[in-house]
């Protein structure tokens, strides 16, 4: 099924910026888009400039190799024929491959000790979107019609775990000395768990992927306000980076925006009816985190390491946070059900 058959097209933009403080950009991003297909990746490296840059590049290259080859050879039928489950498996396998490459690279070079990266990505096919995620970069769904924003991914950070357990508030988390510490990232160990999410998109929806250089300075409702104020993803992405930099730009900042448009509304409705959609958000299959581990300091200093073992059990499917629903794996998708998201004022 080609893009004309679905009645959908995607408009996209991708930007990354060093920020106002850092000398190097350890973020790597990638965006491939054609008609109603897109693959977007944000990876935020850590462990020092050279190590972080290399780790995030490895993550991006591994995923590109997994899914772009068929498209580069014009094999759209292959991409259309792939099941969502197969796509998810390919993306997860690519992340695990990248993780092993990073671990091996660090073990072979003492100067790269502590290297690692986050990775957040989405593969879009028409109105289908499949996300895979490790770390604290984020994916958001912004509903243009009803003006709300939903955080799709869960941060794998120490402070978010403390918030979820009721030990600290969101406000305290923003000032916590361990706010930059992750309990899961590529490069920590040979094995890695990957979160997988699936949702359906509608015309007018925007997907936004970003590194924490954006969310450190810009609140979710502000992100949505900027994105919805401009129909051009390129201008919206530029405005978000400018806003983050105007507020200090303490970290590298990366933004990818994907806007869903209906080129043939009637054809789109026919395809959606035929697909018998149920707007379901699929949360990670293994919701219990037994232990939290990381070798990453608040300053990304590989010599200043932290290991957090067996702090508490955490049910990942019930992480409440700004702009993110806290429903069970069978709950209606918050993006279209009216629950659990930041709503913007009209106008």
Regions found by a protein language model. Give the residues of each.
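PP2C/PPM-type serine/threonine phosphatase catalytic domain
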Residues: 1-347
